[in-house]
Design a protein with these regions (language model features):
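Broad, structure-driven detector of short, well-ordered beta-strand segments within folded domains
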Residues: 92-101, 175-178, 240-254
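Structural boundary/hinge residues at secondary-structure and domain interfaces
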Residues: 19-166, 171, 217-240, 278-314, ...
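A conserved glycine-rich beta-strand in the N-terminal activation segment of trypsin-fold
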Residues: 167-242
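Hydrophobic h-region of N-terminal signal peptides that target proteins for export
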Residues: 9-17
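Solvent-exposed coil/turn segments that connect beta secondary-structure elements
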Residues: 37-39, 112-116, 182-183, 190-192, ...
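Sec-dependent signal peptide recognition
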Residues: 1-9
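One face of beta-strands
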Residues: 30-34, 93, 107-111, 246-250, ...
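Surface-exposed interaction/gating patches
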Residues: 219-275
């Protein structure tokens, strides 16, 4: 959990128009790809309301978990060592994964953020971080580099993902951080990083968002995050073949005062798409009944509030659309109301945590 919190800080970002999502460097053979863009000017993250919301959330979380008080110090430590401003609205990421038939997974992450390459190198050398090589590009052991940045990140580094290897196979390469230039970091195992770096230098063809998917992304207004899956690049199974599933796309965007989410799944035919449309619409129809609960049992104030929040959230979800071989789910939430919902959920969680029995200390 600590690692996830730290990584969330490191890759915080969001948006430009869909055509400006930068997939350069992402291998075209990845089954799953994702990207974000600059969040500059967005109400969800780069507005007075967003900053006030973030400050309130930080205060609430600090009361719940004292270790979160170290987040500012951690950000400052990262900036001092690398020059990276984690709160810059211009930070962006892109990447993806490919899946093997035996369950093995490989992939990479491209972090586009302004940083000081000389400062990063000097820090890594001073902290004796192990070096790695991706072709002609020098890098550092990701786990060791993370641990060297701050005490809080050193604790998180213990949960750093270790690439799995098959029994009897040679030890897998560690995940590295490779500094391509003052605006680009590549995070991947050395062999994969070398492939990504070649693509960034124009050697080969990178992934490109298919023109048929752009309308779904653009329909969110000003899109700031996209996630796409291509079933043809997934390991073949009879179940996948029978389903007719071809792929899916998820996009988040901002349109005026609203946050828009679109999820579309594509199938080989209208007939193959129909079961998914029916299942999705059925789940939406059942949701209010599930929220109603058992009228014979008394509800606590907390349960009533959580039900009200769930109902408010579901109110933003529109009926499922089925058009030919495509099934689409759309949701729309007012940005300020969304802030309010998230804040209430965290506050309820904090209240429950404080009321829970505390572990005995000697």
């Amino acid at each position: 959990m600590r690692l996830l919190s730290c990584l969330a800080l490191v890759i915080t970002s969001a948006v430009l128009p869909a055509q400006d999502f930068d997939f350069k460097g992402v291998p075209a053979d990845y089954a799953i790809v994702f990207a974000t863009a600059s969040s500059r000017g967005l109400k969800i993250s780069d507005s007075p309301e967003a900053k006030a919301f973030k400050a309130r959330m930080e205060k609430t979380l600090a009361g719940l978990d004292p270790s979160t008080k170290d987040s500012k110090e951690m950000q400052e430590a990262i900036k001092a060592a690398t020059g990276i401003d984690l709160e810059s609205p211009d930070n962006r990421i892109a990447g993806g994964v490919t899946l093997g038939a035996a369950g093995q997974m490989s992939g990479g992450l491209i972090v586009r953020t302004r940083h000081d390459s000389k400062k990063l190198s000097a820090h890594a050398v001073a902290k004796k971080v192990s070096t790695l090589q991706a072709g002609a590009t020098k890098g550092w052991n990701g786990q060791e580099l993370l641990a060297s940045l701050s005490d809080e990140l050193a604790k998180a580094a213990k949960d750093f993902p270790t690439p799995a290897t098959a029994p009897g196979a040679p030890a897998s390469e560690p995940i590295g951080v490779f500094d391509l230039d003052d605006n680009t970091l590549v995070i991947a195992q050395p062999k994969e990083a070398a492939r990504i770096i070649d693509l960034l230098k124009g050697k080969g063809t990178s992934y490109a968002l298919n023109a048929s998917l752009r309308p779904q992304v653009n329909a969110t207004g000003r899109p700031y995050a996209v996630f796409a899956m291509n079933a043809a690049k997934l390991p073949a199974t009879p179940e996948l073949s029978d389903s007719g599933f071809q792929g899916a796309i998820f996009a988040m965007g901002e349109n005026g005062s609203n946050q828009i989410m679109k999820i579309s799944a594509f199938f080989t035919s209208k007939e193959k798409a129909a079961p998914m449309a029916m299942q999705a619409q059925g789940m939406l129809a059942m949701a209010p009944m599930m929220l109603a609960g058992d009228p014979s049992k008394p509800e606590t104030a907390e349960e009533k509030e959580m039900k009200a929040l769930a109902a408010e959230f579901l109110a933003g979800v529109q009926p499922v659309e089925a058009a030919g071989n495509q099934v689409t789910l759309t949701a729309k939430w007012d940005t300020l109301k969304l802030f309010g919902m998230l804040e209430k959920i965290v506050a309820i969680g904090a209240t429950k945590a404080k009321a829970a029995p505390q572990p005995l200390t000697k």
